[in-house]
Amino acid sequence: MDIAALKRDLDGLKVDDHPAIVQQKSRDFYWYSPVLKQQLEHVTGDLIVTPKTEDEVVRILAACHRHGVPVTPRGSGTGNYGQAMPLSGGVVLNLAEMNAVKMIAPGRVVTGPGAVLAHIDRATPAHTGQELRRSPSTYTPASLGGFVAGGSGGIGSIRWGGLRDLGNVIRLRTVTMEAEPRVMELTGEDVLKVMHAYGTNGIITEVEMPLTASYDWIDVIVGFDDFMDAAGFGNDLAIQDGILAKLITPIAAPIPYDYFKRHQRFFRRGQSIVVLMIAPHAMDAFLAFTARSKGEIVFRADKEADLKGLPPAYELTWNHTTLRAIRVDPTITYLQTRYPSPDHLGHVKAMVDRFGDEVPAHLEFIRFDGAIGIAGLPLVRFTTAERLDEIIRIHEDNGCWIFNPHRYTLEEGGMKRTDEVQLAFKRETDPQGLLNPGKMIAWENPDYDYRSGKSFLFKGLEKAG
């Protein structure tokens, strides 16, 4: 790896080797996990290279290939598992300046990978009265390319399912890591080759996404004395086909009172809540539906006189629930779970009863293959890595799937098996394994046994440490 020669080849491009800047841009939100914080704290790249065009990306990748320098792509750096952290050093490819909104048409938008989701949604309504179908809770800073390469769902998934569901990404344009990099257009099922692949098998340079009707969504919070009543309310609302909701998030006490400091005045400490985004035209029906429940509306953004300083409702949900807890109590961490249907509420109750306040519940209602399901992002009052692993094992022993946010590899953070399609595509597009090394176990160690119970340690990371 000849960094000096690479810098000469990149003359005229935006290159930064200031140690503080390089370290800053070599990190994401890995510190959500105490395990990853310890493992990845020392990780840093050698250079930050910031292209403005696809042609510059091609030039950068060709030069890195020539000098054997690894490349790790970065959007806004808001991922949680070290997706954008360069385990083998090398170049961090900062795509933030490829942020143009190139085309807006009925039902679709085309952007560069660095386009920020909130900026896209500011541009699209004036043209077509539409918005993106879904977004993470990091909507304000997150880039679309980063969301496609590292995300899975978010606000809007109650209507539109997961990001990898067919039709939720229309087209991707990517560049390969070869001596002469190729530009590829992926559509249909082919987009799955690079989606949620952390940039291990191609650099995304353009994204085409579907749009849906835009509304001035109303933030609502409903309070409950019992968490399972809150969860049941969320489930019942999710199956109301006539009430348009963009977000249905039950959160157990004492999370709201203890960690949602700006909203704290609306809650009692023992009160669980459901955080919601409701379409304006659905509010009357929603109010009638809520009146049948055991809940009380404790907050309505359209009725609250003083909204100054209050974050939007979505910044209480998804990964922001954990973020707000960590800001108050740095020992907090979290899990990512899926409670199997049709008895998803039964599985939730079993885990709530088993762990109590050690693992306070946080649910997100989403759509799976046309049916309502529950993803969980429960908080964990962290004590030791061994206890964290035990909590994970108990969930799995009780039929709950864990997508482990305390691992930096695709497989361990997913279904604990090789994605043969993504692996085959990497063989085609990155034959030297220079794109985001260490993140795909199937490439680094094809014989790895996922049943071993041991976490995978990338040899390059071990050397760097």
Give residue spans per PLM region.
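N-terminal flexible segment immediately upstream of the FAD-binding catalytic core
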Residues: 1-62, 78-107, 253-264, 309-329, ...
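General beta-strand structural signal in soluble alpha/beta enzymes
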Residues: 15-18, 50-51, 71-75, 93-95, ...
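A conserved active-site cap/scaffold subdomain adjacent to cofactor or substrate pockets
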Residues: 256-300
